[in-house]
Amino acid sequence: MTKREVAEARSQFVAMGNELIQKKRYNLSLWEQKLVLYMVSKITPYDAPGTDYIFSYNEFEEVCNLNKDGGKSKKLVYDMLLELSTHPLEVKLTEHQTLITHWFNNAVFDDKTDTVKLDFSKYLVPYLYNLQTLYTQFCLENVLAMKSKYSVRLYEYLKSVKNLGYKHLITLDELKSRMGAENYDLYKDFRVRALTPALEEINKYTDLEVDYQERKTGKRITAIEFKIVAANEPSRFLNRQRALND
């Protein structure tokens, strides 16, 4: 790919329904998340549900800055998609209904062309196609520079609630669930290993400037209040370029 083609691919928007962002539960690695978002960025407003999306290993390497290691990118992509096929995606539909599905219906690998063909689960159609209202979009490049899986998930969530107001209050348990960090029982561990690194990357690479305050019930921290404003994009763009071109 030319530098221009790489830049254009990175500048594509990821668009998802807010319900999917705010109510989904899954356990994916950083690179598995990037692969999913990379594929979502390929959806255009004119695509019909059931559309197949094809990408080459070389394209994924260059756009997402996957470190090339002796031609192993093909195996890395294969392994990621294999893992994705075993990790369910849960979406809370109503108080009494939960959808359990996967991101993709099928993955077809073509060794002759070194490409992969994917199509999204039909159950995700309402959250990915023909979006008119109550959806969130962001530039793919904003998450490609991130090195923490928690950064990606927190950024998605904060983008989806940004228009609700300058401040956003969320319980600690719900925040851990949104970030996939339920394994941190102690707040200190969660703050040091998940929340702080995520906010550092969000404030370095994205279009959001985020601060927070801890809220207590008695002596125990039980909620986080985020302050979310638009960031100075030119400086963030330079930070992303440095990270992606290392």
Language-model segments: what does each one mean?
Residues 1-246:
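Charged, alpha-helix-forming regions
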